[in-house]
Structures are given as C-alpha cells and as structure tokens.
Amino acid sequence: MIIYRDLFSGDELCSDTFPMKLVNDVVFEFTGKHVVRKLGEVTLEGANPSAEEFDEGTEEQMESGIDIVLNHQLMEMPMYQDIKIFKDWIKEYMKKLVEKMKSDGESEESISKFKKNMQEYVTSLLKKDRFKELQFFSGPGENAAEGQLAIVEYRQVSDTEQPIVMLIKQGLVVEKC
C-alpha cells in the first residue's frame, strides 16, 4: 500500500486504496464514496468484512461522511470557503512549495511548468459556480496549518455523485508500507 503524506505537516492525507488519477502533473484526484459506518471503523476499498463477526447487540455510534476523510481523520476547514482566505493561503503555500522545489534542486524549467499548471488549476477552482461547491480539509496533526488542503468536489461519475479529493502532487511525500 502507498500512503500519501503532507510534505510540510507529515499528516497522512490519502492512500492508493482509492481510485486516483493525476491531472496536469500537479493534482492527484482520488475518488471517494459517501459512507455510513461504525464510529472509528476503517474500510479499505475491496476489503471483505468477515461473515463471522459477532454482534453483541450493544448500541453503536455511527459516523457518516466521505470515506477518504474518515479513514485519514481529515478535519473540515470551512473558513477556506471564503475566497479571499483561500487566495491568501494558496499564494503562501505556492511560495513554500516553490522554495522547497528550488532547495531540492528542481530545474527552472520544471518549476516554471509547475507554476503554469498550478495557475490553470487554481484559476479553474476560483470560478464562482465551482468554488462555492468546494469543501476544504486539513490533516489531523498539530502542524496541519503548515500543510496543504485536501479540496473536495462532488462530480457525476457513472450516474452517481461521488466526492473527488484533490491533493497537490508536489506537496506530498509517497511512503510505501
């Protein structure tokens, strides 16, 4: 399994147990599902729960939400639904990413391509009809403010509305488990 951790906060943001695609070499889009499950239960895509599980008949607390958000304990950050706050955040976050890319020895050509592709991505997010539908989440750790936002958008996929979790590729560390 591959875990995607935030480059700056170290928080686990997603894993390869969810269908994903890379867009424009800058954004991973993970397809999640809206789920209802026992509080704290983690269900991996393709897992087969045991038929032998014993039910003691006790009342259980349930939770509902996006499986990716629940599995990785992401925290909703509604303040970023204010477009000005989001713009300020993305501007500062981009500066940090570019500085990190430079310190890691990335070529100027690579950095320029990244900036161009990110500009296109951010411009598409900021369209009023689209931006007002987005949800924002951060990692659960104490350094979450240092990291990136997981941006969620609901889209029609095969006749059902599914949550798409968007993460900036260059802001992730890939960890094999």
From Swiss-Prot:
GO cellular component: cytoplasm
Pfam families: TCTP
Keywords: Calcium, Cytoplasm
Purpose: Involved in calcium binding and microtubule stabilization.
Sample GO molecular function, one term: calcium ion binding
Family label: Belongs to the TCTP family.
Protein name: Translationally-controlled tumor protein homolog
Cell compartment(s), UniProt: Cytoplasm
Domain TCTP: 1-177
